[in-house]
């Protein structure tokens, strides 16, 4: 498969999921607006860093490389990244193609103080709400 084919397949999968997502966008927006900020934003953290900043990534597999580390503990790895000085942690949440999950994102969010990025394919406003 070529990279374009991987991307086409992944985007098609996410567009289909978005089409079948029946959650109320208004309700999701209300939920987001009621949440308290828990720490610095990604932008605030990066701008506050002196020199180079590292965004560490949690990824179990990739469509092009296959299994990378399927049995990794996302929380343990995020904490190790934070101790090592990572400015932010990027968590893949696509299970089908990358082995990630929303649970990984939530668990990592609870376990570290650095900003967390949800890394996924964003094809719908609900995806932004999920982030």
Task: Indicate where each model-derived feature is located.
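An N-cap/entry alpha-helix motif that binds or orients negatively charged groups
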Residues: 2-69
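Short, glycine/charged-enriched secondary-structure capping and boundary segments
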Residues: 25, 70-71, 103-106, 131
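Alpha-helix-loop-beta-strand connector modules within alpha/beta enzyme cores
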Residues: 39-50, 99-123
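Structural preference for beta-strand elements that scaffold enzyme active sites
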Residues: 53-57, 88, 115-117
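Glycine-rich beta-to-alpha transition loops that act as phosphate-gripper elements at the mouths
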Residues: 57-61, 68-72, 95-99, 118-128
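Alpha/beta enzyme core
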Residues: 68-92, 110-112, 126-130
